[in-house]
Amino acid sequence: MAREGFTLACKECKMENYISKKNKKKHVEKLEINKFCSKCNSKTMHREKK
């Protein structure tokens, strides 16, 4: 299957907050999104982690 699951981890505190899926064939690079981190209590950059 082309769709693969991964977690999004906060860049500042390294806490894994979100689970998502993406098409690995279309999007090869790692995903980076601004999301809310409950540990930091603010919006921070989250990066894809396996």
From Swiss-Prot:
Instruction: Name the UniProt key words of this record, in alphabetical order.
Output: Ribonucleoprotein, Ribosomal protein
Stored NCBIfam families: PRK00504.1 (NF001764), PRK00595.1 (NF001860), rpmG_bact (TIGR01023)
Provide a GO biological process annotation.
Answer: translation
Record-linked HAMAP family = Ribosomal_bL33
Q: Which GO terms describe its molecular function?
A: structural constituent of ribosome
Q: By what name is this protein known?
A: Large ribosomal subunit protein bL33A
Family label: Belongs to the bacterial ribosomal protein bL33 family.
Keyword Ribosomal protein applies: yes
Report the SUPFAM superfamilies cross-referenced here.
Zn-binding ribosomal proteins
Gene Ontology terms, cellular component aspect? cytoplasm; ribonucleoprotein complex; ribosome
